[in-house]
């Protein structure tokens, strides 16, 4: 069940009204993954097939991917759950051995996927194409702000953050390039540290969204 108020796979259930309990899941995720247990550091999660469609080269490619610089330059944590292309699995293992703020589980673990959705502050999903996409909807439901590329279902379900008004439910990038992903994650991390009231309001807005989630899921199943 993808519902933070009823999810039996997370340590602490919560709603938009009790969103402070979300923090328990973050601390549990940090501890489980061997990260510094610190509520103040923004945690970015990704759950993905390690396939070209998902923008993995732009994140993880050894020569030009942005993951290494992101983790070196920004005071953030990065948790990865996924499996797929061998080169990418190997590169993630290399990154993990060199970066104390990047931790990964190569494979699939259903309970961990729920903990990442509940415990992350942001969810990275820079897909090359995404007809519908479910993870960004789970993220919104769990008050975990999506960082997505403007394509398909991602563009339809995530409203880009407006720094002036504080409106939005996530952070949207237009171009699938390492620099664009780096910049957009950096923007989210900046907002985390400097626009805390905006972030909290966005989480509330995300959790309360009614955009036909069930209908979208049904359409996805039909496809």
Regions found by a protein language model. Give the residues of each.
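Catalytic cores of carbohydrate-active enzymes across secretory and cytosolic contexts
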Residues: 1-223
């Amino acid at each position: 069940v993808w519902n933070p108020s009823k999810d039996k796979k997370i340590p602490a259930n919560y709603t938009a009204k009790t969103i402070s309990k979300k923090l328990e899941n973050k601390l549990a995720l940090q501890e489980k993954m061997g990260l510094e247990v610190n509520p103040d550091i923004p945690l970015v999660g990704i759950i993905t097939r390690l396939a070209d469609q998902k923008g993995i080269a732009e994140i993880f490619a050894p020569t030009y991917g942005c993951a290494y610089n992101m983790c070196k330059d920004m005071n953030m944590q990065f948790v990865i759950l996924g499996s797929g292309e061998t080169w990418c699995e190997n590169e993630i293992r290399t990154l993990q051995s060199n970066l104390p703020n990047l931790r990964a589980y190569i494979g699939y673990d259903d309970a961990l996927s729920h903990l990442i959705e509940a415990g992350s502050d942001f969810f990275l999903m820079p897909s090359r194409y995404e007809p519908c996409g479910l993870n960004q909807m789970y993220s919104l439901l769990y008050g975990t702000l999506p960082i997505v590329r403007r394509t398909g279902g991602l563009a339809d379900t995530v409203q880009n953050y407006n720094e002036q008004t504080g409106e939005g439910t996530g952070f949207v990038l237009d171009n699938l390039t390492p620099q664009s992903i780096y910049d957009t994650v950096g923007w989210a991390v900046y907002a985390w540290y400097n626009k805390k009231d905006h972030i909290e309001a966005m989480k509330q807005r995300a959790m309360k969204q009614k955009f036909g989630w069930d209908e979208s899921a049904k359409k996805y199943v039909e496809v």
